């Protein structure tokens, strides 16, 4: 009862082909809905959903469920505008900032499969993730801050794109204040630009065993 279902499952476990088990396989839901919308439906929209507290920059901020859903549903619309649909893959190569959370939940909202790659990872490692995932869009930031240094992401991303055999169709880059970088249109656009004409979108219905994300170990 704690999980929202568009269609409640009648079968809990399919164990006919172990070890490839399927859970709730006839159920239909959405992980973004269960992370955000359900809490708003239950009257908790004004409660805090996300706290950002950076020990490097000292920046602090809080987002309610309503605020976070608004950001997520609009960026989900921005992804749609860039051609991302259900089943498409999106690589998220970002520092630990609120926009990274927004990007992940936005993918879940529209049924896209996200793959988080540690921000600052070497170009060859990022290239291998691009090739393996066959990502349509890469979401990144201009830089990341680590103790005693700034890691410029754009050169790393540019090199990874050159190295990868699979070519992404679009890059969406979040410009960090004071560390803005030049973008090459039309394949590269800023986070803010992607949102300029985007409309908020609702959650798509997902079968329980459809992919949500790719996590490399």
Residue ranges and their predicted role:
Residues 1-35, 39, 175:
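Flexible, non-catalytic linker and terminal segments flanking ANL/adenylate-forming cores
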Residues 47, 52-79, 196, 200:
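Glycine-rich adenosyl-nucleotide cofactor-binding module
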Residues 36-40, 68, 72, 90, ...:
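Adenylate-forming
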Residues 35-64, 174-182, 212-214:
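AMP-dependent adenylate-forming
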Residues 31-35, 72-75, 103-104:
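Structural preference for long, well-ordered alpha-helical segments in enzyme cores
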Residues 109-193:
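Structural core segment of the AMP-binding/adenylate-forming
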Residues 22, 78-127:
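Conserved AMP-binding/adenylate-forming
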């Amino acid at each position: 009862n704690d999980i929202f279902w568009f269609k409640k499952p009648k079968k809990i476990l399919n164990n006919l082909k172990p070890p490839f088990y399927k859970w709730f396989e006839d159920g239909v839901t959405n992980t973004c809905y269960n992370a955000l919308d359900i809490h708003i439906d239950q009257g908790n929209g004004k409660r805090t959903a996300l706290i950002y507290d950076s020990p490097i920059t000292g920046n602090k901020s809080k987002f309610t469920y309503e605020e976070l859903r608004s950001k997520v549903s609009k960026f989900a619309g921005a992804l749609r505008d860039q051609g991302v649909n259900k089943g498409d893959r999106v690589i998220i190569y970002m520092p630990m900032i609120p926009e990274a959370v927004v990007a992940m939940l936005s993918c879940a909202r529209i049924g896209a499969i996200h793959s988080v790659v540690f921000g600052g990872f070497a170009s060859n490692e990022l290239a291998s993730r691009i090739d393996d995932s066959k990502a349509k869009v890469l979401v990144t930031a201009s830089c990341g801050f680590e103790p005693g240094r700034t890691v410029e992401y754009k050169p790393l991303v540019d090199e990874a794109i050159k190295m990868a055999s699979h070519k992404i169709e679009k890059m969406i880059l979040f410009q960090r204040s004071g560390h803005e970088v030049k973008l090459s249109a039309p394949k590269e656009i800023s986070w803010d630009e992607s949102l300029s004409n985007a409309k908020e979108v609702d959650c798509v219905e997902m079968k329980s065993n459809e992919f949500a994300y790719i996590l490399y170990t």
